């Protein structure tokens, strides 16, 4: 864990944090499964004008299907996943055009589209209040941080 968190309470070990919140590391079979877009997902991906944005959309959708989270990454960090998407979905292309940094606004726009595709929406004030109430009730049973974390996650 980094020094900036040295004074904080430790609930999970670094490996546990990575397992829960880290970028997925897929096997070849998992790549086939998670990067196989539905017709609707493929249509949404293909609406992007550049190959880079199409590949980014399929990657983000696949990672979201796996972990129900979004991640910040560059193509060179997920090279094997990029190659898989190119081979499976855009075979005449190669990764030469995928060198530029991914724009934040593009990433966020795609994430909003993915959330809509899967029927997710933002948490409203009533739902946040319900979570706070559940946390308060849970703390009455046990104030152990790991217990609270497990119940609320």
Residue ranges and their predicted role:
Residues 2-153:
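Long amphipathic alpha-helical coiled-coil/heptad-repeat bundle
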């Amino acid at each position: 864990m980094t020094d900036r968190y040295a004074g904080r309470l430790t609930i999970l070990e670094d490996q546990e944090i990575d397992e829960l919140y880290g970028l997925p590391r897929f096997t070849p079979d998992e790549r086939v499964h998670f990067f196989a877009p539905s017709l609707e997902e493929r249509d949404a991906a293909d609406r992007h004008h550049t190959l880079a944005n199409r590949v980014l959309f399929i990657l983000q959708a696949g990672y979201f299907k796996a972990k129900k989270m979004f991640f910040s990454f560059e193509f060179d960090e997920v090279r094997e996943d990029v190659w898989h998407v190119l081979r499976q979905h855009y075979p005449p292309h190669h990764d030469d055009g995928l060198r530029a940094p991914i724009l934040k606004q593009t990433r966020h726009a795609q994430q909003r589209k993915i959330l809509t595709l899967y029927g997710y929406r933002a948490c409203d004030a009533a739902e946040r209040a319900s979570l706070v109430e559940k946390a308060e009730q849970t703390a009455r049973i046990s104030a152990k941080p790991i217990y609270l974390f497990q119940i609320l996650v």
